């Protein structure tokens, strides 16, 4: 098969594109000297990508540094294994970059685009770099068998589809304990109150200010550089085991990652002291701190409530109610609530008498000691 090569001018360089047919042939042949780089936003990559591709989404702050020429391409990878793979192979492999749809890329801004900038930088570093004509959308339309999709296809056909999060179209699975597929960190727009009634869909689109320096948010908030700058956030507490710290290599943010999934077996309370210390460090430096998990309604809420309990000497109920007044769709899993009850006892705090109307009793256990607790409704409206 003859590969179609099309010259694409940018700056003073000449880039070459590869066709989707050529790429399909290389994948069919099992070409091990092929390095695919997906230049789309991470949520699109997580949703679906060409097999074996590694993601190289570029935040605005790092794009500016790349334009200035003082940042190597390897620094753009958020995962160590991707960075190592690129470093080992970029000098010998054929590097092919793709975005969502690059068929008209050469007619637009050329070197001002992300593809143009990356191609020039890769060639400057001695790589044999090309871009994929038509991008991911064209390849997926013609050769879907060589695309990896993160939708859960194991559900019975008779079962209704589960909610799909806005973060890259990841489908939530109720029978998986993995972080991304946890049914407990569910779509905020589908959250329900303690009586099962739907909460308002008019939830804040930005992180919620709990205290003047403390913000509660979701994964999307942690990737929005404009939002982080607007709220003066320089510290980011990531309460997930596998969501990347997107701006870690930029050097302008301090991260702490708590590797906890939203599952009944997880002991989040063991991380309370270091999480509280991290938040206090941000406060001491007059910086904003964002506490986030995936959907911003379970793990990050638990940590935020624990912080309020310790620093403001509040009972679990009172601290929970403060957070709920700020963000009505919070919903920590019951075992995390049990750990907060343990934490309340450790702090020597006690909840005041609750005069609210009784609701059906709920029970949960904590993974640390397997005690069983009876819980009244913690939701106040």
From Swiss-Prot:
<dbReference type="GO" id="GO:0070848">
    <property type="term" value="P:response to growth factor"/>
</dbReference>
<dbReference type="Pfam" id="PF00782">
    <property type="entry name" value="DSPc"/>
</dbReference>
<dbReference type="GO" id="GO:0051409">
    <property type="term" value="P:response to nitrosative stress"/>
</dbReference>
<keyword id="KW-0832">Ubl conjugation</keyword>
<dbReference type="InterPro" id="IPR029021">
    <property type="entry name" value="Prot-tyrosine_phosphatase-like"/>
</dbReference>
<comment type="function">
    <text>Dual specificity protein phosphatase, which mediates dephosphorylation and inactivation of MAP kinases. Has a specificity for the ERK family. Plays an important role in alleviating acute postoperative pain. Necessary for the normal dephosphorylation of the long-lasting phosphorylated forms of spinal MAPK1/3 and MAP kinase p38 induced by peripheral surgery, which drives the resolution of acute postoperative allodynia. Also important for dephosphorylation of MAPK1/3 in local wound tissue, which further contributes to resolution of acute pain.</text>
</comment>
<feature type="compositionally biased region" description="Polar residues">
    <location>
        <begin position="189"/>
        <end position="203"/>
    </location>
</feature>
<dbReference type="GO" id="GO:0009410">
    <property type="term" value="P:response to xenobiotic stimulus"/>
</dbReference>
<protein>
    <recommendedName>
        <fullName>Dual specificity protein phosphatase 6</fullName>
        <ecNumber>3.1.3.16</ecNumber>
        <ecNumber>3.1.3.48</ecNumber>
    </recommendedName>
</protein>
<dbReference type="GO" id="GO:0030154">
    <property type="term" value="P:cell differentiation"/>
</dbReference>
<feature type="domain" description="Tyrosine-protein phosphatase">
    <location>
        <begin position="206"/>
        <end position="349"/>
    </location>
</feature>
<keyword id="KW-0378">Hydrolase</keyword>
<comment type="subunit">
    <text>Interacts with MAPK1/ERK2.</text>
</comment>
<dbReference type="GO" id="GO:0043065">
    <property type="term" value="P:positive regulation of apoptotic process"/>
</dbReference>
<dbReference type="InterPro" id="IPR000387">
    <property type="entry name" value="Tyr_Pase_dom"/>
</dbReference>
<dbReference type="InterPro" id="IPR020422">
    <property type="entry name" value="TYR_PHOSPHATASE_DUAL_dom"/>
</dbReference>
<feature type="active site" description="Phosphocysteine intermediate">
    <location>
        <position position="293"/>
    </location>
</feature>
<dbReference type="GO" id="GO:0070373">
    <property type="term" value="P:negative regulation of ERK1 and ERK2 cascade"/>
</dbReference>
<dbReference type="GO" id="GO:0005654">
    <property type="term" value="C:nucleoplasm"/>
</dbReference>
<dbReference type="InterPro" id="IPR008343">
    <property type="entry name" value="MKP"/>
</dbReference>
<dbReference type="Pfam" id="PF00581">
    <property type="entry name" value="Rhodanese"/>
</dbReference>
<dbReference type="InterPro" id="IPR036873">
    <property type="entry name" value="Rhodanese-like_dom_sf"/>
</dbReference>
<dbReference type="GO" id="GO:0004721">
    <property type="term" value="F:phosphoprotein phosphatase activity"/>
</dbReference>
<feature type="domain" description="Rhodanese">
    <location>
        <begin position="30"/>
        <end position="148"/>
    </location>
</feature>
<feature type="region of interest" description="Disordered">
    <location>
        <begin position="176"/>
        <end position="203"/>
    </location>
</feature>
<keyword id="KW-0963">Cytoplasm</keyword>
<dbReference type="GO" id="GO:0004722">
    <property type="term" value="F:protein serine/threonine phosphatase activity"/>
</dbReference>
<dbReference type="GO" id="GO:0060420">
    <property type="term" value="P:regulation of heart growth"/>
</dbReference>
<dbReference type="InterPro" id="IPR001763">
    <property type="entry name" value="Rhodanese-like_dom"/>
</dbReference>
<dbReference type="GO" id="GO:0005829">
    <property type="term" value="C:cytosol"/>
</dbReference>
<keyword id="KW-0904">Protein phosphatase</keyword>
<dbReference type="InterPro" id="IPR000340">
    <property type="entry name" value="Dual-sp_phosphatase_cat-dom"/>
</dbReference>
<comment type="similarity">
    <text>Belongs to the protein-tyrosine phosphatase family. Non-receptor class dual specificity subfamily.</text>
</comment>
<dbReference type="GO" id="GO:0017017">
    <property type="term" value="F:MAP kinase tyrosine/serine/threonine phosphatase activity"/>
</dbReference>
<dbReference type="GO" id="GO:0004725">
    <property type="term" value="F:protein tyrosine phosphatase activity"/>
</dbReference>
């Amino acid at each position: 098969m003859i590969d179609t090569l099309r010259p694409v001018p940018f700056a003073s360089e000449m880039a070459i594109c590869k066709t989707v047919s050529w790429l399909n042939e290389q994948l069919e042949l099992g070409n091990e000297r092929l390095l695919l780089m997906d230049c789309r936003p991470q949520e699109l990559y997580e949703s679906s990508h060409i097999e074996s591709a590694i993601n190289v989404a570029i935040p605005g702050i790092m794009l500016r540094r790349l334009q200035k020429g003082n940042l190597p391409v390897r620094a753009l990878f958020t995962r160590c294994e991707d960075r190592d793979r690129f470093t080992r192979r970029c000098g010998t492999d054929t590097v092919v970059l793709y975005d969502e749809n690059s068929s008209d890329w050469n007619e637009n801004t050329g070197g001002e685009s992300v593809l143009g900038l990356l191609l020039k930088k890769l060639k400057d570093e001695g790589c044999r770099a090309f871009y994929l004509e038509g991008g991911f959308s064209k390849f997926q339309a013609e050769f879907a068998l060589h695309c990896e999709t993160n939708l859960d296809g194991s559900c019975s056909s008779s079962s209704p589809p589960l909610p799909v999060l806005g973060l890259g179209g990841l489908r939530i699975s109720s029978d998986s304990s993995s972080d991304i597929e946890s049914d407990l960190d569910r779509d905020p727009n589908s959250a329900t109150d303690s009586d099962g009634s739907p909460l308002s869909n008019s939830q804040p689109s930005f992180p919620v200010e709990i205290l003047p320096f403390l913000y509660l948010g979701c994964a999307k908030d942690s990737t929005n550089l404009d939002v982080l700058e607007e709220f003066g956030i320089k510290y980011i507490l990531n309460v997930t085991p596998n969501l990347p710290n997107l701006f870690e290599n930029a050097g302008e943010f301090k991260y702490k990652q708590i590797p906890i999934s939203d599952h009944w077996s997880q002991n989040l309370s063991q991380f309370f002291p270091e999480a509280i210390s991290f938040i206090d460090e941000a406060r001491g430096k007059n910086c904003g701190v964002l506490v986030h998990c995936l959907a911003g309604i379970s793990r990050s809420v638990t940590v935020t409530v624990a912080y309020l309990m310790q620093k403001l000497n509040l009972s679990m109920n009172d601290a929970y109610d403060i957070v709920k007044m700020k963000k009505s769709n919070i919903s920590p899993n019951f075992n995390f609530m049990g750990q907060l009850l343990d934490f309340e006892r450790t702090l020597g705090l006690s909840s005041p008498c609750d005069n609210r109307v009784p609701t059906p009793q709920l029970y949960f256990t904590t993974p640390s000691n397997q005690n069983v607790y009876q819980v009244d409704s913690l939701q106040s409206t």
